[in-house]
Amino acid sequence: MDSTPLPVCRLHKSRSHKVCKEFSGYSKNSMGFYYGIKLQLITDIDGIPLSLQFTTTKTGDRDWLEQETQTTFKDCGYLFVGDKGYCGVEFHKKILNTGNYLLTGIKRSKKATLPLALWQLQLLKLRARIETCFDKLKDYYNLVSTKARSPLGYQLNWIISIFSLVVGW
């Protein structure tokens, strides 16, 4: 599970951008600032999407995952593998209370206290598959396109890109 930014226009054109003004916003990630929305995605071990949602930039990844585990994946017994942004004892307990499990990497400040087992390290290496899924969506299936002239055009482009990924898998 992870999220990726979907810019709807370039940052310097964001003030005059009117098409997606209702659901777009400013945010920052490791690559810098952007104006757009976020795609939240949960995939299985093969990289096939199980759940996805387009959210505003203000929606936190942890909030979305908590909502998904309480509705879609309640009492399923899934093992979710996430990055270090999903760390936290209280958050792990919330996910465990929904009947699911959460495996995350260990932050640098906690590395001396909690060693991971070999199978956990191998599962964390599989997390790169969701990044590959995002790369395919953006590079091959043109998920990030700023050529649409209406909100429906953006949504149609996003749906076609995700459908192409699922069918092409």
Feature-to-residue mapping (PLM):
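Polybasic low-complexity intrinsically disordered regions
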Residues: 1-84, 88-97, 107-108
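Short, solvent-exposed polar/charged micro-motifs at secondary-structure junctions
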Residues: 7-13, 113-115, 157
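Structural motif
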Residues: 29-32, 147-158
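A structural signal for well-ordered alpha-helical scaffolds and beta->alpha junctions
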Residues: 58, 88, 127-130, 156, ...
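A general structural signal for well-ordered alpha-helical segments in protein cores
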Residues: 62-65, 134, 160
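Helix-centered, glycine/charged polyanion-binding patches within enzymatic domains
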Residues: 79, 84-150
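Charged phosphate-binding loop/patch that engages nucleotide di/tri-phosphates or the phosphate backbone
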Residues: 153-169
